[in-house]
Amino acid sequence: MADPVRLIVGLGNPGREYEDTRHNAGVWYVDALARRQGVFLTEDKKYFGLTATFSFEGETIRLLVPTTFMNRSGQATAALANFFKIPVTQILVAHDELDLPPGCARFKQGGGHGGHNGLRDIISRHGNSRDFYRLRLGIGHPGSADRVTPHVLSKPSKADRDLIDRAIDEAVHNTADMLRGDLNSAMNRLNGFKA
């Protein structure tokens, strides 16, 4: 068994102009998980984000959506994790993933930032530790590097958004395994899913 997850972070950019863009897929996941748990995210300036808590098998699980821009996501994550003494190995970060198509999602532990500025800042703010869990939510690749920024900062087509939402629903369904520290079960179940 791996470490159980105690903090779940959804990456994105703040503001209405970004809320429906691909780069906010991590926020969509945390929003869906909060709805499933019947909790509401509220602003907490101390942690530079929107937060909520719920109980799972007697443990407190914390949700966080940073209200900083993507490249400052580590500021919020570190503030909350440090205050509640949550080790980096008990953090799950949900983020958009160019290297997976819409409709795919994958849990993993560790790894680099892959050019993702939110992950880069989280790694930096946690003493260069890469040992947190990730939920990679596929948004597809636009085909060339010069089109990546416009791609992640634009809205997906209705068909792609439906696929992303179905993958998020499946990830939410399998989050309980992550909360128990059963990474292998969570990975096997989610890796077998394709919307």
Curated annotation (Swiss-Prot):
Superkingdom per UniProt: Bacteria
GO molecular function term, any single one: peptidyl-tRNA hydrolase activity
Catalytic activity of the protein: an N-acyl-L-alpha-aminoacyl-tRNA + H2O = an N-acyl-L-amino acid + a tRNA + H(+)
Residues the record marks as site: Discriminates between blocked and unblocked aminoacyl-tRNA: N13
Locations listed in the record: Cytoplasm
Keywords on record: Cytoplasm, Hydrolase, RNA-binding, tRNA-binding
Catalytic residues identified in the record: H23 (proton acceptor)
Site feature location: Stabilizes the basic form of H active site to accept a proton: D96
Gene3D superfamilies: Peptidyl-tRNA hydrolase
Binding site for tRNA: Y18, F69, N71, N117
A Gene Ontology BP annotation from the UniProt entry: protein quality control for misfolded or incompletely synthesized proteins
Family from the record: Belongs to the PTH family.
Protein name: Peptidyl-tRNA hydrolase
Source species of the chain: Alcanivorax borkumensis (strain ATCC 700651 / DSM 11573 / NCIMB 13689 / SK2)
Lineage: Bacteria, Pseudomonadati, Pseudomonadota, Gammaproteobacteria, Oceanospirillales
Gene: pth
